[in-house]
Every structure is written in structure tokens, then in C-alpha cells.
Amino acid sequence: MDVSRYLRLAMLAVLTGLAACAGEVPPEQPAFYRSMASADAEVDGPTAASMISGYRHNNGLGAVEVDPDLMRLAQEWARSMAARDKLDRGASRDFNKSLAGAGFNAKKTVENISAGYHTLAEAFSGWRDSPPHRANMLNAGANRMGIAAVYAPQSKYKVYWALIMATKDSS
């Protein structure tokens, strides 16, 4: 075999290898590991509901469903905390009034707030490891939820979280 044939085969092998590399798309990061530390980041509600429902199932409780009204209220709450650069329940003072105004009649509501966690996985782990937050996620009657994270780049914590879980009053 002559040298030019070896060179052609070697070049073909290199090009085939490069083409294979160019065709590979890196796998997308799971939603619970996506950073919320960007202005366009949004919590994936169904992923959060699945994660919380799985945790509840492991503790003998029923699943929760994403509720659009609770998602909107959680977003407003997280946005309010981020705007004030303050982690507090002040935004929830008229919480039941806000729920009723949104057409959501609740028998009971519980909420978790936090700041500084950059991913859903971190926020969930923090809540799971905190007895009062854990109790809220394991509230026996809860059947609906809303969750949000808001990025505030100039703030102390950068990302503010709000989770609202409720028992919808069907009467």
C-alpha cells in the first residue's frame, strides 16, 4: 500500500471522528439542578410537584398538584421579598385574602420561604432538613401547590423562594 492511501485513510478516520464529536449534544441538565440565579430562570412547577409528591408518598401522604393561582401568588411573594431584599412573611399578611381574591378557596394553607438556594434541589433539601419546613411539605391535607424563585442580583441572597401548599375547599 502506498503512502498516499495511508494518508487518505488516516484523514478519513480523523474526519469521521470529528463528525461524530460535532453530532453529540450534551444532555440537558435535570430541571431540579437548573440554577435560578438568572433573570429568565423559572422554577419548573411539575418537576417541583413531582419531587414534593414523591417525598410525601415516601411518608404515607398523597400527591400535590400545581395550581396556577398558587403559582402566581408564590411568584408575587418571592418578587416582593426580592424587591425588599428581605426574607420575611410580611408579604403574606393578607395571604388568605389574596387567595380568595384569586378565586382559590382554601381550607388550610402552609408556606415555606427561603433565600440563597440557587436550585430547586437545594431549596427542597433545605426545607426537608428544617423541621418546620418539613412539616409544611408533609401537611396531610395539602393537595395543591405553587412555587417560585426570583433572582435579585444586587441582593444579599440573590435568589428568593416561596412555596405555597393548600387544601382546596371544594364546598
Question: Model-predicted segments: where are they?
Answer:
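Sec-dependent bacterial lipoprotein signal peptides
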Residues: 1-19
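Bacterial Sec signal peptide processing site at the extreme N-terminus
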Residues: 15-39
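Post-signal-peptide N-terminal segment of Sec-exported extracytoplasmic proteins
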Residues: 27, 36-84, 97
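Extracytoplasmic
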Residues: 43, 61, 69, 108-110, ...
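Conserved beta-strand positions that form and line the central face of beta-propeller blades
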Residues: 63, 112, 164
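Short, surface-exposed glycine/acidic/tryptophan-bearing loops
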Residues: 71-118
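Disulfide-stabilized extracellular recognition modules
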Residues: 119-171
